[in-house]
């Protein structure tokens, strides 16, 4: 509930990032959250992208980090710097707890065991969907208005029969 409150607070920019595999979860969360509220950014999964994002991370900001075993030094370093700059840190991690747990204000754990050599992302995706549902419930009707506005803006940028025509005119 506390994490949903934080994510629903429109006055607090939210930055999201992950590791080698979990970056996809951060991108999925951002793809939903920005439709519900402003100021939601994914931090690029590159050394320069991470450093560049830190330029703008400030005291009221939230850094939501996905970090599961095979914990990455660059993700830990990014979080350490964001925390030093005053960001609230939300960590989504496995039961073994990323070292980021020591820095985090909020820690959510997900099971990652799978019948393969790779950790399962399914529980992380389910948690993303639960967080999004919580934010929708918290923000109420304002989310519908924002989504409607976004859909209206997208009308000129989506595929339709005319866009598929070579001449751009009706055939």
Language model segments and positions:
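HTH-adjacent hinge/linker in prokaryotic transcriptional regulators
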Residues: 1-2
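A short, charged, Gly/Pro-tolerant segment at domain boundaries
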Residues: 141-171
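Glycine-rich phosphate-binding loops that contact phosphosugars or nucleotide phosphates
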Residues: 8-127, 133-137
């Amino acid at each position: 509930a506390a994490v949903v409150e934080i994510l629903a607070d429109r006055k607090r920019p939210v930055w999201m990032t992950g590791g080698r595999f979990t970056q996809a979860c951060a991108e999925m969360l951002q793809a939903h959250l920005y439709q519900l509220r402003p100021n939601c950014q994914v931090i690029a999964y590159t050394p320069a992208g991470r450093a560049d994002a830190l330029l703008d991370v400030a005291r009221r900001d939230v850094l939501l980090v996905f970090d599961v075993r095979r914990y990455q030094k660059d993700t830990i370093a990014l979080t350490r710097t964001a925390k030093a700059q005053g960001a609230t840190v939300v960590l989504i991690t496995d039961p073994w707890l990323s070292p980021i747990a020591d820095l985090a204000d909020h820690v959510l754990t997900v099971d990652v065991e799978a019948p393969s050599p790779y950790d399962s992302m399914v529980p992380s995706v389910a948690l993303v969907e639960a967080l999004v549902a919580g934010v929708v419930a918290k923000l109420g009707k304002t989310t519908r208005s924002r989504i409607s506005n976004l859909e209206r803006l997208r009308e000129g940028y989506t595929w339709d029969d005319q866009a598929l025509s070579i001449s751009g005119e009706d055939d």
